[in-house]
C-alpha cells in the first residue's frame, strides 16, 4: 500500500494548527540508520486509509520527496471528539531484522461449531489482535482463528492460533497465553432449559 507524504519544515503547536487548517496532518518517520524526518500528509486521504485494516497491519511504501521507504504505522493520535487525525508515527523497516507488531484476528466458522449448533452458545471474541514477531517479508495481514470445533464452556487461547511459517507470538504473549475467544451459554437459555426439565413428568 502506497502513502504519499511531504517534507515538513515548520514545527511547533502554531505550525501544526496552520497545517490542520489547510487540510494537512503532521507526522514523523523514524528508525533505521536515517535521522527522524518530519512529514505532513493530506488529512482526507489519511482518514480514509486509516479505515482500512491493512493500513494498520501491513508494510507501507511511504513516498517523501520522490523517495520511497518501507514503514509500519506505529501510532495515531486522534482529536478527542472531532473526526480529526492530529498526528501519525511511522517506523522504518529493516528487511533483515525481526519486527514486533500486532496482527488482526479474523474469527471463522463460529456458526458451524458445536457450541452454537448444539448448545446455542454465544461465541465471544475476547481480543481482536495479537502481538507477533517476524521478519518483514513474513508479516501477515491478519491471522485466522478457526472456531469450528469450539464447544460450550470452552475457550481458545493465543497458542491455539495456527501461525504461518516464520511468525511467532511475542515472548510475553507466549508466556501468558491469553484467552482470545470463549463460548458461553446465555443465562436465560440455562434457566429455560432448567424450567423445561422441571416441567417434565417422570415416567411411571
UniProtKB/Swiss-Prot annotation:
Keywords, alphabetical: Ribonucleoprotein, Ribosomal protein, RNA-binding, rRNA-binding
GO cellular component terms, A-Z: cytosolic large ribosomal subunit
Signal peptide: none
RNA-binding keyword on record: yes
Entries under InterPro entries matching the protein: Rbsml_bL25/Gln-tRNA_synth_N, Ribosomal_bL25/Gln-tRNA_synth, Ribosomal_bL25_b-dom, Ribosomal_bL25_C, Ribosomal_bL25_long, Ribosomal_L25_dom, Ribosomal_uL5_bac-type
One of the protein's GO biological processes: translation
Origin: domain of life: Bacteria
Gene Ontology MF: a single term: 5S rRNA binding
Family indicated by similarity: Belongs to the bacterial ribosomal protein bL25 family. CTC subfamily.
Subunit-level organization: Part of the 50S ribosomal subunit; part of the 5S rRNA/L5/L18/L25 subcomplex. Contacts the 5S rRNA. Binds to the 5S rRNA independently of L5 and L18.
Protein purpose: This is one of the proteins that binds to the 5S RNA in the ribosome where it forms part of the central protuberance.
NCBIfam families associated with the record: bL25_bact_ctc, PRK05618.1-2, PRK05618.1-5, PRK05943.1
Name of the featured protein: Large ribosomal subunit protein bL25
